[in-house]
Curated annotation (Swiss-Prot):
Binding site for [4Fe-4S] cluster: 269, 287, 317, 352
Protein name per its UniProtKB record: Putative ATP-dependent DNA helicase DDX11-like protein 8
Highest taxon, organism lineage: Eukaryota
Taxonomic placement: Eukaryota, Metazoa, Chordata, Craniata, Vertebrata
Family to which this protein belongs: Belongs to the DEAD box helicase family. DEAH subfamily. DDX11/CHL1 sub-subfamily.
Binding residues annotated for ATP, in chain numbering: 44-51
C-alpha cells in the first residue's frame, strides 16, 4: 500500500497506510515527549500497531530535529555569530561542538572589552567547528550515497582485495616454513599449546584498552566518528528485534534511515573456532584475548623484545580487519539490514560483524539492540554506546524491573565453589613455579574467598560436597557488609580482585586448563582426593546418558556455565554493590552441593539511573504496562527522576468494545469465589471451577485457555476432577491439554492443541475444539499468541499472588517500606508490590487473546476480589472500560452465550 503522510496538529507523520486514530494519538504524544525531553510510559495493546507507531513517531521527531539543527547551523555560518542567549530552543546545539560556546559565564568584575573579546573568540571557534562538522557530515552522506548506487563495483573491489590478501598470506606462510623447518614448527606448536594456559605478568595499574571496551589500537582512529543524535531501540529477544527491523523496512523511513543492529559476540561472531566454544563468557574472553594479542604483538614488534614468547604465538582473529570492517560498516549503513544479513555479509567480506556494528554506531540514526546491552553498564561501555543527549526506547518493557534485577542478581552453589577451588589448586600446582608473585598473590586470595564462602555455608572445602551433610538447614538473609564480616573476608579488596579476574582472564585460562587436561592430581594428593576426582567427573556432561534418560517435567533444562569460576566472578562483582542496595541469601539445604549463596539486588534504579540521567528522553513501552506505579516508584523515583518529568499514555484497543470481560463473584451453587491460600484447596472450590468450565465449554465454540496460579495447584485440581468425574465431563465437551513444566515440551503441546482446534473446526462433532489448562508465569502466559480460534475464551482462576513466605519477597517488601514514602490512603509500598506483581501476571495472561482488529474473545475472571475498585484500576484501560461484574453465575453465562452466538452468526 502506498505511503501516506498524516498531519496531526502541525506535525507530519509519514505512515505506510491510513493509521488508526489511536496510532495518531500515540505518535503525537511520543513526539511531544521526545521534544520536551521527558520520560514516557506508553501502553498500546497488541494488535494496535505499536511498532509502527514507535517507528514513525520517533523518526518523524528525529527528522524535524535534524532539520532545525541544520537551519540553525546555516544561520550561524551565514552570520558568523554564535547563538543568542534568549533563544527558546537551546537543545538544537547538542553535539560536542557546542560545548564552551558563546554564553560561557565570565568572572565578575572583568572589563567589558575582555568579556567582548572572549565572547567573539568563542563565537568564531563555534563557527569553525560547525564548518568542520558540516564538511564531515557531507562527506559521510556522499560516501553512503555512492555505496547505494555502486554495490556491484564495491563487491568486485572486495573480492580483489581478498584474493590479494590470500596470495600474500600464502607467500608469508611459505617463507616461514622455509625459515623454521618442520622440527622447529612442531616444537613451537607444543609450546604454544601449553604456554597459552599460563597467566601473563599482571600489572595492576595498567589500563588495557580492549578489556574496558575502548579502541583496540591506533588503526581505529580513521574509523572514529562523531556520534550524531540517534534513537536506541531495545527489546527482550533477538526475534523481537528482527521483527522490529522488518517493520522499519516496511515503513516510509525504510529507504533513508541509517540503522544498525547490535548483538552479542555469540550472535554475531563469524570465526567458527571461537563460535564453537559455545558459552557466551568463553566467546567474549577468547575474542578479547585475540584482540589483545594482536595489540601486544604489534607493540612487541615495535619494541623488538616482547615480554613473553607466548604473546607472539597467540593467533589474532583473521576477521578483525579494519579496511574490510570499514567497508562492511558503510554497506550496513547504506540500507536497512537485519542480523542474519549482517552475518552473511561478514562471512562473505571476511570482516567481523560484531566490531563492524560498533564502528557503525556513531553515524547511525537508529540503533537496535537487546535489553542487556543497554541496561548493563559494562556491556554498554564495551559496545561503544554513548547515551549522552540521545533517545532511548525500551519496548516490551512490562518486565523491565525484573529484567534489571535478574541481570544483576547472581546465585552460586556449593558444588560450583568446590569445583572452582579444586581446579584452581590443580592449576597452581602445575604452573605455580612459572607465575609471577602478583599472580600468585591474587590466586591465593581467590582460593581464600572460595574457602570462606564454603565455610559460611557450613561445609568443608576439602571434602566432596555431594557427601557433606550440613548440620544447619534453612534460609538466612544478610546485608552485604554483614556477610563480608561473617565470612571473614572484609579485609580483602574485592574491587581489586574483580579487576584482576577481568584483566587476567583467569577463568578462561582455568577453563582451557581443565578442558585440556581434565582433573589432574599429583601422586601425593591422589589418595586424599580420589573421591573428589570422581565428583568432578560426575559434573561433566554425559551425552549418552542424557539421551537415554527420560525427560523430567519437574525441572526445565538450565544451561550450565562453562566454568564455575566464570559464574563466581559475577558473584564477587555483585558483592561490590552498595550495602543498602542488595542482600546476600544463604540457603542451606541437605547437602553442601545443593546449598547456595545468592546476591539479591533490591534497588534496580541504581543501574537505571545513569540511563535516565544521560539521555535526552526515555520511552518505556509495552502492550500491557499496568500497573505503572512500580515503574514510577521503583525505577524512576528511586533513580532521582522528578514526577513532573514522567508522562503516562495509554491508548484504547482497535477491537470493538463488545468483547466482554467479566468478573464472576460466585459459582453455580452460589459458592463465593475467593481463591485465597486458605480456601482454594477446599473440594467445593475446585468443584466450582470444574462446573464453571463445563458450562463455558458448552457455549464457547473454539479454544478455551484457563490459567491457574501455579503448576502445583493445576495438578491438584486436575487430580480432584479426575477423582470426582468432572474431568470426564469436560473431556466430553473439549479435548483437554495441559501445559508441561518442561520448557522443551511446550511447543509440542501447543502444536497438538492447534491441530485439534483446526480439525474440529473442519469436522463439526460433539467435541468442540479444545481446552488448554495453563499456568500464570509459565511459557504460555507470555509470548504465546492465542489469536482467533486458539483463544475464544480466557479464564483466570483466582488471583496469582506471589509466595508471600518467600525470603526474597519479604526482604524486597521491607526495603520498599523503608525506602518509599507511603501515600495517604494507600497501602504500604511493600503490600502494593505484591498486588502489582499479581496484576501484572494477570494482565500478561489475559493479553494472550484478541490479537488483531477482527479478533474476539470473552475474558472471565473467577474471583470476587477482582470486583474491588483498587484491583479493577490495575487492569489495562481497554479492559477496565468495558468490564462487567456479575454477582451470580446465571447472568454471566447468559452474557457469554449471547456474545458468542452473535459472533458465530456474523462470521
Amino acid at each position: 500500500m502506498a505511503n501516506e503522510t498524516q498531519k496531526v496538529g502541525a506535525i507530519h507523520f509519514p505512515f505506510p497506510f491510513t493509521p488508526y486514530s489511536i496510532q495518531e494519538d500515540f505518535m503525537a504524544e511520543l513526539y511531544r515527549v521526545l521534544e520536551a525531553g521527558k520520560i514516557g510510559i506508553f501502553e498500546s495493546p497488541t494488535g494496535t500497531g505499536k511498532s509502527l507507531s514507535l517507528i514513525c513517531g520517533a523518526l518523524s521527531w528525529l527528522r524535524d530535529f535534524e532539520q532545525k539543527k541544520r537551519e540553525e547551523e546555516a544561520r550561524l555560518l551565514e552570520t558568523g555569530t554564535g547563538p543568542l542567549h534568549d533563544e527558546k530552543d537551546e537543545s538544537l546545539c547538542l553535539s560536542s561542538s557546542c560545548e564552551g560556546a558563546a554564553g560561557t559565564p565570565r568572572p565578575a568584575g572583568e572589563p567589558a572589552w575582555v568579556t567582548q573579546f572572549v565572547q567573539k573568540k568563542e563565537e568564531r571557534d563555534l563557527v569553525d567547528r560547525l564548518k568542520v562538522e558540516q564538511a564531515r557530515r557531507k562527506q559521510r552522506e556522499e560516501r553512503l550515497q555512492q555505496l547505494q548506487h555502486r554495490v556491484q563495483l564495491k563487491y568486485a573491489a572486495k573480492r580483489l582485495r581478498q584474493e590479494e590478501e590470500e596470495t600474500e598470506n600464502l607467500l608469508r606462510l611459505s617463507r616461514e616454513m622455509l625459515e623454521t623447518g618442520p622440527e622447529a614448527e612442531r616444537l613451537e606448536q607444543l609450546e604454544s599449546g601449553e604456554e597459552e594456559l599460563v597467566l601473563a605478568e599482571y600489572e595492576s595499574d595498567e589500563e588495557k584498552k580492549v578489556a574496558s571496551g575502548h579502541r583496540v589500537d591506533e588503526d581505529e582512529d580513521d574509523l572514529e566518528e562523531e556520534h550524531i543524535t540517534k534513537i536506541y531501540h531495545c527489546s527482550r529477544t533477538h526475534s523481537q528485534l528482527a521483527q522490529f527491523v522488518h517493520e522499519v523496512k516496511k515503513s516510509p523511513f525504510g529507504k533513508d534511515v541509517r540503522l544498525v543492529s547490535l548483538g552479542s559476540r555469540q550472535n554475531l561472531c563469524v570465526n567458527e573456532d571461537v563460535r564453537s566454544l559455545g558459552s557466551v563468557q568463553l566467546i567474549n574472553d577468547r575474542c578479547v584475548d585475540m584482540q589483545r594479542s594482536r595489540h601486544e604483538k604489534k607493540k612487541g614488534a615495535e619494541e623488538e623484545k616482547p615480554k613473553r614468547r607466548r604473546q607472539e604465538k597467540q593467533a589474532a582473529c583473521p576477521f578483525y580487519n579494519h579496511e574490510q570492517m570499514g567497508l562492511l560498516r558503510d554497506e550496513a549503513l547504506a540500507e536497512v539490514k537485519d542480523m542474519e544479513q549482517l552475518l552473511a555479509l561478514g562471512k562473505e567480506a571476511r570482516a567481523c560483524p560484531y566490531y563492524r556494528s560498533r564502528l557503525a554506531i556513531p553515524a547511525a540514526k537508529l540503533v537496535v539492540l537487546p535489553y542487556q546491552m543497554l541496561l548493563h553498564a559494562a556491556t554498554r561501555q564495551a559496545a561503544g554506546i554513548r547515551l549522552q543527549d540521545q533517545v532511548v526506547i525500551i519496548d516490551e518493557a512490562h518486565n523491565l524491573i525484573d529484567t534489571i534485577t535478574g541481570m544483576h542478581s547472581v546465585e552460586v552453589s556449593g558444588s560450583q565453589l568446590c569445583q572452582a577451588h579444586s581446579q584452581l589448586l590443580q592449576y597452581m600446582e602445575r604452573y605455580g613455579k612459572r607465575l609471577k608473585a602478583k599472580n600468585l598473590m591474587y590466586l591465593k586470595q581467590i582460593l581464600y574467598l572460595l574457602e570462606k564462602f564454603v565455610a559460611v555455608l557450613g561445609g568443608n572445602i576439602k571434602q566432596n560436597p555431594n557427601t557433606q551433610s550440613l548440620s544447619q538447614t534453612g534460609t538466612e538473609l544478610k546485608t552485604i557488609n554483614d556477610f563480608l564480616f561473617q565470612s571473614q573476608i572484609d579485609n580483602i579488596n574485592l574491587f581489586k580482585v574483580q579487576r584482576y579476574c577481568e584483566k587476567s582472564m583467569i577463568s578462561r585460562k582455568l577453563f582451557g586448563f581443565t578442558e585440556r587436561y581434565g582433573a589432574v592430581f599429583s601422586s601425593r594428593e591422589q589418595p586424599k582426593l580420589a573421591g573428589f576426582q570422581q565428583f568432578l567427573q560426575s559434573l561433566q556432561p554425559r551425552t549418552t546418558e542424557a539421551l537415554a534418560a527420560p525427560a523430567d517435567e519437574s525441572q526445565a533444562s538450565v544451561p550450565q556455565p562453562a566454568s564455575p569460576l566464570m559464574h563466581i566472578e559475577g558473584f564477587l562483582a555483585a558483592l561490590t554493590t552498595a550495602n543498602q542496595d542488595g542482600r546476600v541469601i544463604l540457603s542451606r539445604q541437605g547437602s553442601l552441593s545443593e546449598s547456595t549463596l545468592k546476591f539479591l539486588l533490591l534497588n534496580p534504579a541504581v543501574h537505571f539511573a545513569q540511563v535516565v540521567k544521560e539521555c535526552r528522553a526515555v520511552v518505556i513501552a509495552g502492550g500491557t504496562m499496568q500497573p505503572v506505579s512500580d515503574f514510577r516508584q521503583q525505577l524512576l523515583a528511586c533513580a532521582g527522576v522528578e514526577a513532573e518529568r514522567v508522562v503516562e499514555f495509554s491508548c484504547g484497543h482497535v477491537i470493538p468494545p463488545d468483547n466482554i470481560p467479566l468478573v464472576i463473584c460466585s459459582g453455580i451453587s452460589n459458592q463465593p469465589l475467593e481463591f485465597t491460600f486458605q480456601k482454594r484447596d477446599l473440594p467445593q472450590m475446585m468443584d466450582e471451577v470444574g462446573r464453571i468450565l463445563c458450562n463455558l465449554c458448552g457455549v464457547v465454540s473454539g479454544g478455551v485457555v484457563c490459567f491457574f496460579s501455579s503448576y502445583e495447584y493445576l495438578r491438584q485440581v486436575h487430580a480432584h476432577w479426575e477423582k470426582g468425574g468432572l474431568l470426564g465431563r469436560l473431556a466430553a465437551r473439549k479435548k483437554i491439554f495441559q501445559e508441561p513444566k518442561s520448557a522443551h515440551q511446550v511447543e509440542q503441546v501447543l502444536l497438538a492443541y492447534s491441530r485439534c482446534i483446526q480439525a474440529c473446526g473442519q469436522e463439526r462433532g460433539q467435541v468442540t475444539e479444545a481446552l488448554l489448562l495453563s499456568v500464570v508465569g509459565g511459557k504460555m502466559s507470555e509470548g504465546i499468541n492465542f489469536s482467533d480460534n486458539l483463544g475464544r475464551c480466557v479464564v483466570m482462576v483466582g488471583m496469582p499472588f506471589p509466595n508471600i513466605r518467600s525470603a526474597e519477597l519479604q526482604e524486597k517488601m521491607a526495603y520498599l517500606d523503608q525506602t518509599l514514602p507511603r501515600a495517604p490512603g494507600q497501602a504500604p509500598p511493600g503490600k502494593a508490590l505484591v498486588e502489582n506483581l499479581c496484576m501484572k501476571a494477570v494482565n500478561q495472561s489475559i493479553g494472550r487473546a484478541i490479537r488483531h482488529q477482527k479478533d474476539f474473545a470473552s475474558i472471565v475472571l473467577l474471583d470476587q476480589r477482582y470486583a474491588r475498585p483498587p484491583v479493577l484500576a490495575k487492569l489495562p484501560a481497554w479492559i477496565r472500560a468495558s468490564v462487567e461484574v456479575k454477582a451470580t453465575f446465571g447472568p454471566a453465562i447468559a452474557a457469554v452465550q449471547k456474545f458468542h452466538r452473535e459472533k458465530s452468526a456474523s462470521s
